[in-house]
């Protein structure tokens, strides 16, 4: 990889360098665009494809759900085989290696324990004249978890969505996962779901799955909220159904940004950049450093490690399209560039990472020090890996227990408390021209 020398760039040039496309500005690759055009018989943008699929599934239910699954995934679904059966769970458990299951159990325990610390509480507080004010915290009635398929299977996505939903106490947790070409779900994904206690799983993916969860079909009952990452079609579908259901966030391709100084190990840096680049051709991997030696060494090391990867074609395309090694003039500039980027994953690989951390304002998750690589958060440590992307860490938060909960205000006034507040309430209601509001107070206090 080539190094971009930003040491003499102006603030405007740096801002332009760090600017990202919004998720809905990302163009389909030529291969995917050609495949989409062939499927639909005409040129269509990703947004047009999603609008058509969502509208059709909303109108026709199962008929369109099954039609698009056959068209896109090449799998024949029916109302009899769309839901994962007990036999399929048993088959998956027989296939998954014992060491994989044991690792999943330990990872699930870590994720559950971390999210238990996040649990908000219902509370009440005493106010003058015996009144009570408070907040009631309640889980949503149902949630649909989307687990990506495509070029890899992600049991970790099951963990990161289902564990906080379980901790929150959501009564009905549904999972949608694209079926493989054989019409089955990856066994590691099924075993992970079963270990957490999620057994309502539908073999469906893409925009058609999001629409089915949002509006319901004869076979797939609707949910109140949809969470989980996916490709551009899934994200656009989530955007399209907002208001009919709630969603967690609008996420784009995966990202990593590493802040490094001269103490950082180039081998570690290259490995961590590649760990995200292998996700997706659209993934973004960026290193920003104030060390020319580190910048050049990482560029060379990436070429060595890339050649050895099974997914080198995907990782190579990602690095070519969105990978960057940026040489900045000093560490304050490195930090400001990181804040401008607002990355999904931010690694701080410096001599004193905890001295850098307070200056980071925008990041989905931070990984501090040489022994906190991003995959640790992906699989095992406990904090959630469903994170804001595309710069949205400036205003979105990581998926957490409160994602699956609602807060309801509680107001309980006594007669003396209402009498004490009556004049102010009546004055404010009349100032807004809402006489009936004022009357609701007057009828109670005799004014």
Where are these regions (language model features)?
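A conserved active-site cap/scaffold subdomain adjacent to cofactor or substrate pockets
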Residues: 249-321, 325
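General beta-strand structural signal in soluble alpha/beta enzymes
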Residues: 123-126, 145, 175-177, 200-206, ...
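Flexible, glycine/charged-enriched surface loops at secondary-structure junctions
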Residues: 120-125, 246, 283-288, 308-319, ...
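Conserved NAD(P)+-binding/catalytic subdomain of aldehyde/semialdehyde dehydrogenases
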Residues: 195-268, 272-275, 279-284
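C-terminal core of ALDH-fold dehydrogenases
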Residues: 340-447
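Conserved small-residue-rich beta-alpha loop and adjacent elements
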Residues: 125-191
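N-terminal Rossmann-like NAD(P)+-binding subdomain of aldehyde/semialdehyde dehydrogenases
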Residues: 1-141
């Amino acid at each position: 990889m080539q190094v971009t020398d930003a040491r003499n760039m102006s603030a405007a040039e740096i801002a332009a360098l760090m600017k990202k496309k919004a998720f809905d500005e990302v163009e389909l690759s030529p291969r995917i665009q050609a495949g989409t055009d062939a499927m639909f018989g005409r040129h269509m943008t990703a947004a047009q494809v999603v609008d058509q699929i969502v509208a059709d599934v909303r109108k026709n239910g199962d008929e369109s759900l099954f039609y698009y699954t056959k068209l896109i995934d090449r799998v024949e679904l029916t109302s009899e085989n769309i839901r994962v059966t007990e036999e399929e769970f048993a088959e998956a458990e027989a296939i998954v290696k014992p060491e994989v299951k044991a690792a999943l159990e330990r990872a699930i325990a870590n994720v559950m324990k971390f999210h238990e610390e996040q649990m908000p509480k219902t509370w009440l507080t005493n106010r003058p004249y015996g009144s009570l004010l408070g907040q009631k915290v309640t889980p949503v009635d149902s949630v649909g978890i989307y687990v990506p398929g495509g070029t890899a299977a992600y049991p970790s996505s099951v963990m990161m969505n289902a564990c906080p939903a379980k901790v929150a106490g959501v009564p009905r947790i549904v999972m949608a996962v694209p079926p493989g070409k054989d019409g089955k779900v990856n066994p590691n994904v099924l075993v992970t779901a079963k270990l957490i206690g999620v057994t309502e799983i539908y073999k469906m993916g893409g925009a058609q799955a999001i629409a089915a969860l949002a509006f319901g079909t004869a076979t797939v009952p609707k949910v109140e909220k949809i969470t989980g990452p996916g490709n551009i079609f899934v994200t656009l579908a989530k955007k399209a159904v907002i208001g009919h259901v709630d969603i967690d966030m609008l996420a784009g391709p995966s990202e990593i940004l590493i802040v490094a100084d001269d103490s950082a190990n180039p081998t570690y840096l290259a490995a961590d950049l590649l760990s995200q680049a292998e996700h997706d051709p659209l993934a973004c991997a960026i290193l920003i450093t104030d060390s020319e030696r580190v910048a050049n060494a990482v560029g060379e090391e990436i070429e060595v490690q890339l050649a050895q990867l099974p997914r080198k074609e995907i990782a190579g395309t990602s690095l070519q399209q969105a990978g960057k090694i940026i040489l900045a003039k000093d560490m304050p500039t490195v930090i400001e560039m990181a804040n401008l980027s607002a990355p999904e994953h931010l690694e701080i690989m410096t001599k004193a990472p905890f001295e850098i951390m307070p200056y980071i304002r925008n990041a989905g998750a931070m990984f501090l020090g040489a022994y906190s690589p991003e995959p640790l958060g992906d699989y095992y440590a406990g904090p959630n890996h469903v994170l804001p992307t595309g710069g949205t860490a400036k205003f979105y938060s990581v998926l957490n227990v409160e994602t699956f909960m609602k807060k309801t205000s509680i107001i309980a006034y006594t007669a003396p408390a209402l009498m004490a507040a009556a004049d102010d309430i009546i004055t404010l209601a009349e100032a807004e021209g809402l006489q009936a509001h004022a009357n609701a107070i007057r009828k109670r206090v005799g004014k």
